[in-house]
Amino acid sequence: MPNMEPTTKEIKEQKIYQEMGLTDSEYELVCSILGREPNYTETGLFSVMWSEHCSYKNSKPVLRKFPTEGKQVLQGPGEGAGIVDIGDGLGVAFKVESHNHPSYVEPYQGAATGVGGIIRDVFSMGARPIAMLNSLRFGELDTPHAKYLVSEVVAGIAGYGNSIGIPTVGGEIQFDPCYTKNPLVNAMCVGLIEAKDIQKGQAKGIGNPVMYVGAKTGRDGIHGATFASVEFSEEGEQQRSAVQVGDPFMEKLLLEACLDVIRDHSDILVGIQDMGAAGLVSSSSEMASKAGAGLELIMDDVPQRELNMTPYEMLLSESQERMLLCVKKGHVEEIQALFERYGLEAVVIGQVTDDKMYKIIHHGEVVANVPVDALAEDAPVYHKPSKEPARYQAFQEEESFVPVMEDVVGVWKELLAQPTIASKRHIYEQYDYQVRTDTAVVPGSDAAIVRVRGTEKAIAMTTDCNSRYLYLDPEVGGAIAVAEAARNIVCSGGKPLAITDGLNFGNPEKPEIFWEIEKAADGISAACLELDTPVISGNVSLYNETDGTGIYPTPVIGMVGLVEDLAHITTQDFKNSGDVIFLIGETKAEYSGSELQKLQQGKISGRAPELDLTTEKKYQQLLLTAIQEGLVASSHDLAEGGFGVALAEATFKAGLGADVEVPFELNQLFSESQSRFLVSVKPENEAAFAQLMELEKVYRLGVVTEDDTIRVKHKEDQVTAKTTELRSIWEGAIPCLLK
C-alpha cells in the first residue's frame, strides 16, 4: 500500500489534527492517553469519535438534567432507541434523529438517509418499525431556493419511506427566516416490540466473531459526523461528499433479515447495532466499550465497493444500509445462510478480545491500536460558559404587542394563509400514510394514531416545538413544547408515555447559545417531570449556523402515548350539528411570539406566553377522563393562531359551521394563551361533561351548526365568516406558495 498518509511528525508539526476537528488540547490528551503520538488513522478515529455528534462533549452536562426513568420505561437513553411498556408484553421503541447539515447541501439524499438511519436505530433494538413522523423547518417560501429545498426534502422523505413500506403518519412544519440557510430535518421512527426481544448494541464474549451485514462500504459520508459538528459557510455547499446516498430496497431486506435473526436466533445473537454517524468505528467501538471488552478488526475483510480504500476511509465511511452483529462463535454459517436468503452478504470482519483495546489490522499490519474506552467513553466533557443574551431582558421589559384588529375576518384569512398554519395536505399527500393498513388517524389531526394488531389498543404519536417561544424565553418555550405534545396526544384519546428530543441549536461556543440550551433543558425537564413523560432517547444537533447567523432554539419533542381502547380515538373535527362546543382554559391577551405578531410586525419579541404546569396537567387529565368515559365528540388543542384558527380547523372536514359566544374580547381570537382545548360534546352528554369539569375554567360557547358559517360573538360585537371561504384559503396557501 503506497503510504500517502502524513507521518505522526507531520500531523503534530503541521497541526493536521486541527483540520480533522481536534483542538490542540484534545490532541495533547490523545498523546497522553496513548503515551505516544497518534498516527493518521488513529488521529482520524479520535477526531470523529470525539466530535460533538458522537460524543455529546458540549451537551452532556445539559443532558444529565433530563428525567429518564419511570415505571413505563423498558429502555432509556444509551441504546439505538428508547422503549416504553404498553402492557400485554409489548413495548414501543422510538427515537428522533436530525439530518440538518446534509439536507441543506443535498436535500433529497440528506432527508432520505435521515429516514433510513432512524429506521435502523429502531429495528436494531428488535422492534418492527410501524410509523414515521418528521419535524421540518424552512425559511420563508419567497425564493426559488427555499421552494426547491422544501420540494426535495419532502420528496426524499417520501421516496425512502414509501419504498421501504413504512407509513409516514404525521409531523409538523414551521417557516421562519432564521431557517433559510439552516433548514432542520428531524425524522422520528416508532416501532413495536415484544419485550422479550429487546436487543442491546454490545460485543462481548472473548473470541466471538463480529459480522458486517448489508451494503458495501464506499467513500460516501467520510467525516459526516465532524461535518455535522461545525458551523456552515456558503462554501459548505462544496461538502457534498459528506452526504450519503440511500437505497431503501436494500434497507427493507436488511430490516427483515435482522428481525428474523432477532426473532429466531436470539440464542446466538450477542448484540446488534446500526452503522450510523462515524460508521464502522462508532458502532464497533461503542459495542465493545458497552460490554467492557476489546475488539480486533481486519480491514481487508470489509466489503468494499471502491478500489484502494484506506483503513481510515473504511472506518469513517458513512455508507448507508449497514449493520454490525456480534454472534456466538461456531454459529457464523447459520447467520450467513439466513442473510443469504435475503440476498445479503454477512462477513466476519473481526472478533471480541479481552484486552479492552481497539486494534485495526490491514495487510497484516497493525494500523491503529488504542484503548476502546478512550474512543467511546473518554471524550473530554466541556462545561461551556453560559450568558443570558441581551435580548432576553429587553423582551421581559418590553411593552406587550397589541394587534391591529379593525378587520377581524381579514386578519383571520391572512393567518390561515400563513404557511406555518395553513394545511400541509400538499406535503403529506406525497407520503404513503396508509401502507401496512394500521393507520387509524391520518395526518392533519392533532396526533397520528396507529393500531396495534391483535389488540384493542393503539399508539398516538406527535412531534411538536414552537421555536418562536423559545427565542423569547427558552425555559418557558421548552416546557410549552412538551406540554403541547402531550395536549396533542390527550386530544386524540391517548395517555402520554414518554418523549424523545431532537435538540437543534446554534453554535455552543457562543455563551448566549449555550444559555439557550441550558434553559431549554430546564423547561423540558420540568414539564416531563410534571406530566410523567421521561426522556428515553434523543439526538443533539448543534452548530446550526451559517455565516454567523443561527437558528431559533428548536428542541423538537417527539411524544408517544397509549390509546387503551380503539373506542377512545378522538379527532379535532366537529362531528354533528347540534353538538355543544366548550372551551377549556383561560384566554389572555398573549400575542408575543404568535403567528399574529409575526404577520403584523414582521418579527417576534416580548414575553413568551405563560404556562402553569399544574393547570396544564389537571386539564389534560380531566379531558382524557372525559374522552375515556365516551363524553367527547371532538377535541383540538389551541396552538398557533389561537382560538380562531382552532375553531376554523374544527369545521373544515365536515363543512359544518359554529355559533359561539366567547368569554373574551374578539381581538383576543388569535391570542396564543397556553393550556386550552376546544371540545365538542353530544347534547345528551353535556350534563355529564359539565359536571366532570364543574370546578374548572370551562366555558360553554354554543353549538355546531349545519350551515357553513362561523359566528363568533362577545357581548355586542360579532364576526361572521364562511367556512368554505376560510377552508379554500387554508388549503390553497402552500400549493400556491410552492408554485
Curated annotation (Swiss-Prot):
GO-annotated biological processes: 'de novo' IMP biosynthetic process
Binding locations of Mg(2+) 1: 97, 539
Keywords of the record: ATP-binding, Cytoplasm, Ligase, Magnesium, Metal-binding, Nucleotide-binding, Purine biosynthesis
Localisation: Cytoplasm
Annotated GO MF terms: ATP binding; magnesium ion binding; phosphoribosylformylglycinamidine synthase activity
Enzyme Commission number(s) from the entry: 6.3.5.3
Residues at which substrate binds: 98-101, 120, 244, 318-320, 541
Active site: 53, 99 (proton acceptor)
Gene Ontology CC terms, in alphabetical order: cytoplasm
InterPro entries: PRibForGlyAmidine_synth_PurL, PurL_linker, PurM-like_C_dom, PurM-like_C_sf, PurM-like_N, PurM-like_N_sf
Primary localization class, coarse: cytoplasm
Functional pathway: Purine metabolism; IMP biosynthesis via de novo pathway; 5-amino-1-(5-phospho-D-ribosyl)imidazole from N(2)-formyl-N(1)-(5-phospho-D-ribosyl)glycinamide: step 1/2
Annotated Mg(2+) 2 binding sites: 121, 274
Subunit record text: Monomer. Part of the FGAM synthase complex composed of 1 PurL, 1 PurQ and 2 PurS subunits.
HAMAP family per record: PurL_2
Function (record text): Part of the phosphoribosylformylglycinamidine synthase complex involved in the purines biosynthetic pathway. Catalyzes the ATP-dependent conversion of formylglycinamide ribonucleotide (FGAR) and glutamine to yield formylglycinamidine ribonucleotide (FGAM) and glutamate. The FGAM synthase complex is composed of three subunits. PurQ produces an ammonia molecule by converting glutamine to glutamate. PurL transfers the ammonia molecule to FGAR to form FGAM in an ATP-dependent manner.
Annotated protein name in UniProt: Phosphoribosylformylglycinamidine synthase subunit PurL
Annotated organism of origin: Listeria monocytogenes serotype 4b (strain CLIP80459)
